[in-house]
Swiss-Prot record:
PROSITE patterns: RADICAL_SAM. GO terms for molecular function: 4 iron, 4 sulfur cluster binding; lipoate synthase activity; metal ion binding. It catalyses: [[Fe-S] cluster scaffold protein carrying a second [4Fe-4S](2+) cluster] + N(6)-octanoyl-L-lysyl-[protein] + 2 oxidized [2Fe-2S]-[ferredoxin] + 2 S-adenosyl-L-methionine + 4 H(+) = [[Fe-S] cluster scaffold protein] + N(6)-[(R)-dihydrolipoyl]-L-lysyl-[protein] + 4 Fe(3+) + 2 hydrogen sulfide + 2 5'-deoxyadenosine + 2 L-methionine + 2 reduced [2Fe-2S]-[ferredoxin]. It is found in: Cytoplasm. Keywords: 4Fe-4S, Cytoplasm, Iron, Iron-sulfur, Metal-binding, S-adenosyl-L-methionine, Transferase. Its EC number is 2.8.1.8. [4Fe-4S] cluster 2 binds at residues 94, 98, 101. Its main location: cytoplasm. The lineage of its organism: Bacteria, Pseudomonadati, Pseudomonadota, Gammaproteobacteria, Alteromonadales. This is Lipoyl synthase.
Length: 321
């Protein structure tokens, strides 16, 4: 039996190379079998792209990454044009192979010790008042990357004392206690961890993750930091039912999660999980009504909503769709 080829540090695997060894095999989609994108998912491009180019240049010049680009977010033009970005720390190579995600898989390089300072300087230069920091999964690190998150928060606040910081963290598989101990030294203003989908779809969508583990991470952070809002996000269109999503909302509230994002899954390439249906806006409205009824302090529900989409407005409790 041939052994899998050893991954070389820093090499990005995408598309078929990325999903070749996940539990549920994906047959590449044929163009004539892919669902036609409905009109409500059409994104309007801004009249000018100068602001977009300026932000991309600021990221490149400091060796930084945005999840907006790495994950092919449909809202990139809108967010960049408004001068906001979600920064992705710890490199652009993930140790997981989630087949809904467009971030590359591989063997990551050692964390950049200068990244926290460069990130803080870039945020200062961009004059941001609210920033979202996320990361790839780093199962290769003893703390899952928690210390790097804490270092980034500390350096950002040094140069930007009035800023609000939201972190969107991985699940810290097998190292929750160590990660939470570290994050307690530099707690964020909002703590976000995405469940992504209903539990019965984890095997195909989130190989290596565990639904209950993710819920416990959110609850245990809240127990340590009762005044810091907790937040989670979900996608629709992966084969789940609305009732399954409704049960996830109930589970989130039982685990003291206060903020919610719910959006439409979009297939990044033919090698990723196919979209099984496009959820009409009216169904998102129904789920938002349920979220409000369950007691979420803020629920952003709509086809183009993403976890960090207008995160500053979400944190202020303003309507986002």
């Amino acid at each position: 039996m041939n052994r899998p080829e050893r991954l070389q540090p820093g090499v990005k695997l995408r598309d078929a190379d990325k999903v070749s060894r996940i539990p549920v095999k994906i047959v590449p989609s044929e163009r004539d079998t892919m669902l036609r994108k409905p009109d409500w998912l059409r994104v309007k491009l801004p009249a000018s792209n100068q602001r977009i180019l300026d932000i991309k240049q600021a990221l490149r010049s400091n060796g930084l990454h945005s999840v907006c680009e790495e994950a092919s977010c449909p809202n990139l033009a809108e967010c960049f044009n408004h001068g906001t970005a979600t920064f992705m720390i710890l490199g652009a190579i993930c140790t997981r192979r989630c087949p809904f995600c467009d971030v590359a898989h591989g063997r990551p390089l050692k964390p950049d010790a200068e990244e926290p300072v460069k990130l803080a300087q870039t945020i200062r230069d961009m004059k941001l008042k609210y920033v979202v920091i996320t990361s790839v999964d780093r199962d290769d690190l003893r703390d899952g990357g928690a210390q790097h998150f804490a270092d980034c928060i500390r350096e950002i606040r040094k140069l930007n004392p009035a800023i609000k910081i939201e972190i969107l963290v991985p699940d810290f598989r097998g190292r929750i206690d160590a990660a939470l101990d570290i994050l307690a030294t530099e707690p964020p203003d909002v703590f976000n961890h995405n469940l992504e989908t209903a539990p019965m779809h984890y095997r195909k969508a989130r190989p290596g993750a565990n639904y209950q583990w993710s819920l416990d991470l959110l609850k245990r952070f809240k127990e340590r930091h009762p005044n810091v809002p907790t937040k989670s996000g979900l996608m629709m269109g992966l084969g789940e039912t609305n009732e399954e999503i409704a049960q996830v909302l109930r589970d989130l509230r039982e685990h003291k999660v206060e903020m919610l994002t719910l959006g439409q899954y979009l297939q990044p390439s033919k090698f990723h999980l196919p979209v099984e249906r496009y959820v009409p806006p009216a169904e998102f409205d129904e789920l938002k009504a349920l979220a409000d009824e369950l007691g979420f302090t803020h629920a952003a529900c709509g086809p183009l909503v993403r976890s960090s989409y207008h995160a500053d407005l979400q944190a202020q409790g303003k309507e986002v769709k």
